[in-house]
Amino acid sequence: RIYMTNTLKLATHPLFTSFVNSTAAGRAGIASAEDRYPFIDYAAKYVDIVVCHQWENGLNYHYYEALHGSYPLVHNSPFLKDVGYYYPDFDIDAAAVAIHDAATNHDDNIEQYKLDAQAALEKVNPFAPKVIDEYRQRLQALMGD
């Protein structure tokens, strides 16, 4: 089953329904438009793979939630291309390869995935000493100290 969360408002839009119905999953009736839900509640019940496609929102907090939970994250965020299962831009063929890779290899590589995810999360952790130090340096440079 494919749950397309945060798409319920699009469910009656002709282009969206045309797109969904053009896919095998849409024709088979296994893709559904869903409301917006707290990620962890929904993921714990329904998610095997998280696919996040963004346009001008490459630091969406859902990426971090998926990484923190060790969910296989298939995404096109250039800011996180070294973690998860990255595909560039709007490249649907590369996205399909990334989804296949996540589905077939994630469990076998989970320990390395967790290490990579933790390293990525540490870069944005507001309590990490390195982040605090960099922020302090930038403030000092801005203030001329």
List the predicted regions and their residue ranges.
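C-terminal alpha-helical cap of glycosyltransferases
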Residues: 122-145
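Short alpha-helical donor nucleotide-sugar binding micro-motif in glycosyltransferases
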Residues: 35-36, 41-46
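Short amphipathic alpha-helical segments and helix-helix/interface helices
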Residues: 39-40, 63-64, 136
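Active-site donor-binding acidic/aromatic loop of nucleotide-activated sugar
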Residues: 23-36
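Catalytic binding pocket for nucleotide-activated donors in carbohydrate/polymer assembly enzymes
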Residues: 20, 45-125
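A short acidic, often aromatic-flanked loop/helix-cap motif at beta-alpha or helix-coil junctions
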Residues: 10-11, 39-41, 92-95
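Conserved catalytic-core segment of nucleotide-activated headgroup transferases in glycan assembly
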Residues: 1-25
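Well-ordered, non-membrane alpha-helical segments in soluble/globular domains
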Residues: 1, 96, 100, 129-137
